[in-house]
Amino acid sequence: MSTAETLYNDFRLENFFVGDFVSDGIIVKPNGKLIRRFKVEGQSNFKKGTLTLNERFTYDDGEVDKRVWQILCLPDGSYEGYTTDLVGPPPRNHPTENLFSWSYRLKLPVKNIPVTLRFTDMMHFHNNAISNVLSL
């Protein structure tokens, strides 16, 4: 079995996110229309069942944003995520092969007005890289 096959058959976020990471992604409307492109540069740390992701987003229009996720690694193999601008219940899901997705709501400033947005975040893991698709 190849390394990639082993990774996908026993995929764990805490084994993938080790140290520094980079990801490219897009934000799309529910109809698939592209809204923005972004790049995420981050650092990860795993301690006592919690994966911490420190993320720095750079958008194609030059805007920069930061977010820290605390992701609990639960005994049933699922993950539950927390961040400061989360609204409502935390996202929770299991990874499947090389895909991890979850839905959540964040309160974010849009033209300096706080707005609650619903996201579906799909992370595709391939060749030691990540592609993100965020759908509003």
Spans of features found by a protein language model:
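Solvent-exposed, flexible loop/coil residues
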Residues: N15-F17, N31, D121
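Central antiparallel beta-sheet cores of small beta-barrel/beta-sandwich binding domains
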Residues: D24-N112, T116-R118
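Glycine-rich, aromatic-bearing surface loops/beta-hairpins
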Residues: R118-L136
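Amphipathic, well-ordered alpha-helical segments in soluble domains
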Residues: F17-D20, N98, H126
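N-terminal helix-cap/turn-to-beta initiation motif at the start of protein domains
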Residues: A4-D20, F46
